[in-house]
Amino acid sequence: MKIQAIETVAADWSGDYLGIGFFEDSAAIDAGLTQLDQSLQDILQDLVSETEFQGKVGEQPWTRIAGPGSIRKVMLIGLGSPDAFTLDSLRQAAAAFAKAAQKQKAASAGLQLPSWDDDAAASTQAMAEGIELALHQEIRFKSDPDAKKPGEFPQEVHLLGLANQAAAIEKAQQICAGVILTRELVAAPANVVTPSALAETAAQIAEDHGLTLEVLEREECEAQGMGAFLGVSLASELPPKFIHLTYKPSGTPRRKLAIVGKGVTFDSGGLNLKVGGSGIETMKMDMAGSGATLGAAKAIGQLKPDVEVHFIVAAAENMISGHALHPGDILTASNGKTIEINNTDAEGRLTLADALVFAEKQGVDAIVDLATLTGACIVALGNDIAGMWTPEDSLAEELSQASEQAGEKFWRMPLEEKYFEGLKSPIADMKNTGPRPGGSITAALFLKQYIENTPWAHLDVAGPVWTEKENGYLNVGATGFAVRTLVNWVMG
């Protein structure tokens, strides 16, 4: 599929499937249709009347154009109130149009939507993202060869009334390549995406896009004192991999950043085994933080900003065997702090502890970690919103702006220091879990113990990384959540 931005407007375009966006305003709808309708024998006005189209979000009537005209089918796309119009409105509208064009088997499609904030480049990028992500399908594991073929339609999409936007489309496609990589990593089962597979993915990113890669094996992790991370991997027959990808710009970097992703490729719960009804069958996606980290690395490697970025993943399985971590064991992290294990199913924070210590040693200006860390965050915020914890107001503002531009939802949560009382241990520096109330807060407070002076934020993405329901450019399954926010943060 080829996406192009062209100066031609809807009234002059010819092709199989035309989509036109309208705000919720009957006068504007009438005025917008007048010129185009002159060549279509008032078909569009009839469509508006028959379907009672008002321009509301979700309204998408279409009709076939009879006769030998230059357009075969037309779709009207409701955009809602102009006051609520955002870049994500463009993504959603473009996604709906792309899926409709695919369903109608349109070889050529033309889409005309208003620009957001008179910013043609940002608007073009958002539309291209919506199209690319909407048409991505997870079909790798189908046995039918025909099912594995990419969709033939549409073959080309024209973004109408926009000229000289090739760079914006290319940027969208580079970012979407990272999102799609993340989707594929998170969607794949644990017998495919192992710690070694994550390391191999990192190696491919490094080779393709000029990043440097360091992978620490178990012995090297032991030498660095990574007892928390290695404790999680004790029961697995698959070796842990500590992955460190680095992107460096050609010149002096404007700043240095670290992104740390939780990389538990399967979480059985350990000896605190996840039982029926606990969602153990979904625990292949417990590495979604690392998936987003590698997806962001792929995108950043193509975009090549003037920022140095360290992408860090401590990859391991949390399994059961005679060598497994016991409840009551004490682990020592690489900063010397000791941890009493009172729940082996709170393992992600253990891997992140050593990863955060390692990240700070890189001398970066800020660190962001992301993880499917707690079910408590889903209870608090639902499946569509991720939690954000940081003591730094400026970093919180950076991430909020980046997420708003991406159309990904985060909500800043409190780092209530009083709650750390629940993590105190009589025999070690801390326990790895606290009481049930405020579970996502105590998890963030645990991670805070492994940061000394660097500005840091923790993102709990447990809810939004997966969806059971199609929604706009999000198809059922892995969503690729947080990649676009991370990219915007780095580029900002």
UniProtKB/Swiss-Prot annotation:
Where does the UniProt annotation locate this protein? Cytoplasm
Q: Which SUPFAM superfamilies match?
A: Macro domain-like (SSF52949), Zn-dependent exopeptidases (SSF53187)
State how the cofactor is bound: Binds 2 manganese ions per subunit.
- Cellular component, GO annotation: cytoplasm
Q: Where does Mn(2+) 1 bind?
A: 267, 345, 347
Q: Name one GO biological process term.
A: proteolysis
Q: Does the keyword Protease apply?
A: yes
Which Gene3D superfamilies does the record match to this protein?
Answer: Leucine Aminopeptidase, subunit E, domain 1 (3.40.220.10), Zn peptidases (3.40.630.10)
- Required co-factor? Mn(2+)
- Residues annotated as binding Mn(2+) 2 are 262, 267, 286, 347
Keywords, sorted A to Z: Aminopeptidase, Cytoplasm, Hydrolase, Manganese, Metal-binding, Protease
Molecular-function GO terms, alphabetical: manganese ion binding; metalloaminopeptidase activity
- The signal sequence is none
Q: Where is the active site?
A: 274, 349
Q: What EC number is given for this enzyme?
A: 3.4.11.1, 3.4.11.10
What catalytic activity does the UniProt entry give for this protein? Release of an N-terminal amino acid, Xaa-|-Yaa-, in which Xaa is preferably Leu, but may be other amino acids including Pro although not Arg or Lys, and Yaa may be Pro. Amino acid amides and methyl esters are also readily hydrolyzed, but rates on arylamides are exceedingly low; Release of an N-terminal amino acid, preferentially leucine, but not glutamic or aspartic acids
Question: Domain of life, per the record?
Answer: Bacteria
Identify the main location. Answer: cytoplasm
What is the stated purpose of this protein?
Answer: Presumably involved in the processing and regular turnover of intracellular proteins. Catalyzes the removal of unsubstituted N-terminal amino acids from various peptides.
Give the family per the record: Belongs to the peptidase M17 family.
Give the PANTHER family listed for this entry: CYTOSOL AMINOPEPTIDASE, LEUCINE AMINOPEPTIDASE-RELATED
This chain belongs to the protein called Probable cytosol aminopeptidase
Q: Which gene encodes it?
A: pepA
